[in-house]
């Protein structure tokens, strides 16, 4: 595997690709995900998952099931639910926001996201900014070149090393306009950040967001770290073993207070039950929403403290 691409990013791409190809009723379709991976990487991730069946599902006997059946189960139960459902929710919310004046889309921690290459009609009318670590972004651009894709004119790559770079300065230098209504996706990140780091990011987002701008992110609830569900425990253990331990979780009240501190109001919050009903069951997919993980859509309130839903 390319050492510049984390196993997390490759697993996410594999999950998108495998789900798209093998699920009769997919939650989220990404026909480009596989193209960003080499055949060797795809096979390596597949082997990694099959080798870990006993970790994911100790009661399963790999010798008694076909590899494709095992992969389908592990992907749909352990690998794909969070990345796929949050992507489906975010892109649906983005398109709704675009109908009411949103002009810019910022993907924080873009990784191997393919939105800018799947949604050409959106790119024709809106600017998209992919923010990620310089090494990760260099690797992705090499992959894009290898596939022969043309980078859309309205897509800007914004390399940011959060240990030393200023997000606001980097985005504005790349052409971001903080006076324009924007949409920020911040997916799969809050788990790994300290409360202080999350507070710092929200400070930056507050300065970047014009009134009525939107941020969408996923986060673990207050019971996450004490959860008894096996796949939640596995996720916590894998993160720790990979050197990126999960650190933060929030109750609704804690999250509401934190967002209000930075000028954001919660417009919509999806619990696992909501995700199951509104995303998975609606698609007809064979999947269960990840326990203790919520999705939050928050909107920047105006300078006078009032807020109107029609500003979304």
Predicted regions and their residues:
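Short, conserved loop/helix-junction motifs that constitute active-site signature segments
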Residues: 120-125, 176-178, 207-210
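Conserved beta-strand signature within the Rossmann-like core of class I S-adenosyl-L-methionine
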Residues: 208-223
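A short SAM/SAH-binding and catalytic strip from SAM-dependent methyltransferases
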Residues: 174-197
